[in-house]
């Protein structure tokens, strides 16, 4: 094909792909299947590969990702990205309206009008367009500065790479100058469920917001592209021609190619605001994405600067948050699940009941200490709550409604999967199955852990596939994964030749992971990711590690006698020795390589612990940021701890730190230290 014909076909493909993106993400009216869409994109990429001089920054091919970002530069926001004041009280919303009315009256204005919008439960970002082209995207950060994550944001189909013509002076300003758009990146419920299905149970995200926050800070933009995210715009700032009202600006954003909140409504007083909040209290559960409240903004944008802001939030807006959803149901029974280490976890079987827009029939009871604390029995009426988490929890027993006949929840005596007599470790609350080699549940759990994101990160090796591999006898341990054939994989349910090859490719890629990750992936009891890194540093090979005695191991930082004994027990098992031989033969990293260079030394000499919920970071990634800057992560507060990063609802660790006089900082200060 000559260049002229290629250019013509590329133009048609780009227009067609963007049209289907708009139909899917903005209008929810898809016309073709994912497979057909992928074929269009593959053809475009093939042509652009053949004719690289025809690639443009706004081509749909630029959404695919593939680059690795070693660190995210800091961006200073031109205008602070303030957070909104939150309230759970309708009365406080009314007080807000009264304050605004007084402030507007003092400015000589009339009766204010408000725009009510649903509050998306996602991550706030800023986008900058120059001459209509997306040039930079960043996180909110601490409000004054954030991280530049342009490459990751370009993978989100609902973020235009080039602004569409909105007509009028605003678009003229966008084409000839700069426009800033702010909004929320979020993950739809179905995309979130799909992502979690691919991960082992212990590595699953608690909710879509956590998944979104973690995904945006990934270094591999190809992985970001694979996890589908969406964007909703709610703020527009250009040089000239912005509409005078917030509602009109939302319309302009839509014309420029952005998705805006579909439910935005003009409200002329508190009665209309209360009606909007009440209307969406239940209706929000029918939406395909998570919303946790309603945002109210003064409609007249010209008054925003005049009303001003406090140090943290604007005076012209407020967020009403819906309270955590609770429901009453009956605990009908308890089943017991078996984890990768044989631990038995009780799970409540509930009378199906509606909660937060879905039917709930199960809830974790954690362990027998929790059962005792709650005083719960089979047959009890219980209150369950869903507050951000995917899995609801039993929060209390309705003792006034306890039936005459209830049954105590008894610990099982045999493994519910393999029938082996259960045992209990001294000083622990949980029972466990000692049949490590033969229990199918433990085999599945160990392999899923081995493939999990913080271990060897083997894509496409999800729970359903691993269950089939174990049931069919194709694998018994992680070492068997590397002997799988395409024929074996293709013979499984919901697997075709291409899917089988994807798994084999992912297994091959996993051989390039670090020695420290392999140590964590082995699933040694008490050895988490941080301990595995210490082991990798102190013991440069698996062979050396297997030779070390308990005293020598206990001298390694963060190990101690209990973990040392666990490591020795693990390597003494014949099935472990056989698995290690298979892993070595497959080419896995059985010894340490070159250490990764530090980003900086800002945390050098610091022993850091995180407690409570972080708003803008996933815990594991925040800990990795500390390590990349020379710091050490510890699991408990002691006199040796030098720094505590406290998030929302920090508990006993914060209290202990205060008593010991350990320095405590919040998430904003943590980001400044990076």
Swiss-Prot record:
The BRCT domain, residue ranges:
598-674
Identify the enzyme class.
ligase
Listed GO MF terms: DNA binding; DNA ligase (NAD+) activity; metal ion binding
Q: Which InterPro entries match?
A: BRCT_dom (IPR001357), BRCT_dom_sf (IPR036420), DisA/LigA_HHH (IPR041663), DNA_ligase (IPR001679), DNAligase_adenylation (IPR013839), DNAligase_N (IPR013840), Hlx-hairpin-Hlx_DNA-bd_motif (IPR003583), NA-bd_OB-fold (IPR012340)
**Listed GO cellular component terms?**
cytosol
Catalytic residues (UniProt): 119
Family matches, as CDD domains: BRCT_DNA_ligase_like, LIGANc
For this UniProt record, give its keywords in alphabetical order, as a comma-separated list: DNA damage, DNA repair, DNA replication, Ligase, Magnesium, Manganese, Metal-binding, NAD, Zinc
**What EC number(s) does the entry state?**
6.5.1.2
The residues that the entry says bind Zn(2+) are: 415, 418, 433, 439
Q: Which residues bind NAD(+)?
A: 34-38, 83-84, 117, 140, 184, 297, 321
Q: What's one GO BP annotation on this UniProt entry?
A: DNA repair
Q: Which reaction does it catalyse?
A: NAD(+) + (deoxyribonucleotide)n-3'-hydroxyl + 5'-phospho-(deoxyribonucleotide)m = (deoxyribonucleotide)n+m + AMP + beta-nicotinamide D-nucleotide
Per its Swiss-Prot or TrEMBL entry, what cofactor is needed?
Mg(2+); Mn(2+)
Q: Does the keyword DNA repair apply?
A: yes
Q: Which PROSITE patterns match?
A: BRCT
Q: Which family does it belong to?
A: Belongs to the NAD-dependent DNA ligase family. LigA subfamily.
Q: Please give the NCBIfam families that the UniProt record associates with this protein.
A: dnlj, PRK07956.1
Protein function: DNA ligase that catalyzes the formation of phosphodiester linkages between 5'-phosphoryl and 3'-hydroxyl groups in double-stranded DNA using NAD as a coenzyme and as the energy source for the reaction. It is essential for DNA replication and repair of damaged DNA.
What's this protein's name?
DNA ligase
Q: What is the lineage of its organism?
A: Bacteria, Pseudomonadati, Chlorobiota, Chlorobiia, Chlorobiales
């Amino acid at each position: 094909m000559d260049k002229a014909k290629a250019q013509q076909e590329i133009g048609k493909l780009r227009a067609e792909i963007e049209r289907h993106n708009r139909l899917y993400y903005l209008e929810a009216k898809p016309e073709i299947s994912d497979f057909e869409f992928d074929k269009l994109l593959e053809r475009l990429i093939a042509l652009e590969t053949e004719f690289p001089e025809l690639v443009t920054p706004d081509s749909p091919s630029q959404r695919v990702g593939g680059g690795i970002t070693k660190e995210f530069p800091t961006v200073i926001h031109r205008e602070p990205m303030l957070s909104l004041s939150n309230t759970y009280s309708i009365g406080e919303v009314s007080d807000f309206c009264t304050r605004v009315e007084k402030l507007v009256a003092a400015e000589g204005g009339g009766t204010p009008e408000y725009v009510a919008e649903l509050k998306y439960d996602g991550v706030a970002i800023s986008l900058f367009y120059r001459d209509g082209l997306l040039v930079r995207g960043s996180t909110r950060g601490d409000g004054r500065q954030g991280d530049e994550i342009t490459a990751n944001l370009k993978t989100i189909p609902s973020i235009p790479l080039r602004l569409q013509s909105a007509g009028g002076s605003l678009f003229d300003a966008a084409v000839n100058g700069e426009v800033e758009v702010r909004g929320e990146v979020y993950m739809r419920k179905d995309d979130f469920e799909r992502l979690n299905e691919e991960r082992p149970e212990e590595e699953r995200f608690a909710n879509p917001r956590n998944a979104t926050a973690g995904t945006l800070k990934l270094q591999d933009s190809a992985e970001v592209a694979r996890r589908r995210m969406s964007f909703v715009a709610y703020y527009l700032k250009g040089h000239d021609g912005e509409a005078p009202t917030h509602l009109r600006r939302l319309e302009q954003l839509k014309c420029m190619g952005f998705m805006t909140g579909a439910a935005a409504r003009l409200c002329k007083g508190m009665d209309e605001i209360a009606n909007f909040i009440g209307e969406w209290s239940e209706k929000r559960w029918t939406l395909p994405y998570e919303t946790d409240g309603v945002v109210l903004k003064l409609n007249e944008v010209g008054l925003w600067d005049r009303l001003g802001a406090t140090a943290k939030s604007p005076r012209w807006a407020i967020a009403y948050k819906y309270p955590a959803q609770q429901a009453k149901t009956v605990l009908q029974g308890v089943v017991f699940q078996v984890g990768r280490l044989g631990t038995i976890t009780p799970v409540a079987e509930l009378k199906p009941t509606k909660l937060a827009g879905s039917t709930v029939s199960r809830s974790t009871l954690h362990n027998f200490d929790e059962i005792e604390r709650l005083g719960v029995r089979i047959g009890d009426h219980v209150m369950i709550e869903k507050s951000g988490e995917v899995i609801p929890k039993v929060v209390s027993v309705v003792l006034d409604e306890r039936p005459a006949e209830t049954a105590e929840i008894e610990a099982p005596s045999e493994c519910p999967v393999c029938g082996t007599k259960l045992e209990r470790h001294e000083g622990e609350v949980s029972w466990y199955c000692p049949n490590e080699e033969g229990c199918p549940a433990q085999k599945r759990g160990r392999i899923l852990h081995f493939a999990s994101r913080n271990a060897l990160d083997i894509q496409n090796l999800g729970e359903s596939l691993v269950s089939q591999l174990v049931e069919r006898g194709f694998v018994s341990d992680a070492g068997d994964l590397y002997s799988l054939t395409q024929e074996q994989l293709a013979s499984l349910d919901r697997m075709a030749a291409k899917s089988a090859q994807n798994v084999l490719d992912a297994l091959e890629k996993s051989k390039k992971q670090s020695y420290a990750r392999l140590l964590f992936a082995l699933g040694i009891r008490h050895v988490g990711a941080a301990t595995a890194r210490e082991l990798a540093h102190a013991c440069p090979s698996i062979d050396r590690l297997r030779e070390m005695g308990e005293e020598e191991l206990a001298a390694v930082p963060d190990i101690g006698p209990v973990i040392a004994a666990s490591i020795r027990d693990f390597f003494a098992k014949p099935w472990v020795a056989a698995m290690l031989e298979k892993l070595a033969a497959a080419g896995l990293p059985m010894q340490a390589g070159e250490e990764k260079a530090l980003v900086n030394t800002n945390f050098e000499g610091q022993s850091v612990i995180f407690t409570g919920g972080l708003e803008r970071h996933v815990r594991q990634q925040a800990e990795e940021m500390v390590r990349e800057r020379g710091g050490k992560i510890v699991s408990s507060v002691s006199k040796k701890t030098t720094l505590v990063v406290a998030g929302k609802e920090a508990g006993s660790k914060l209290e202990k730190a205060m008593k010991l006089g350990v320095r405590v900082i919040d998430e904003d200060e943590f980001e400044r230290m990076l």
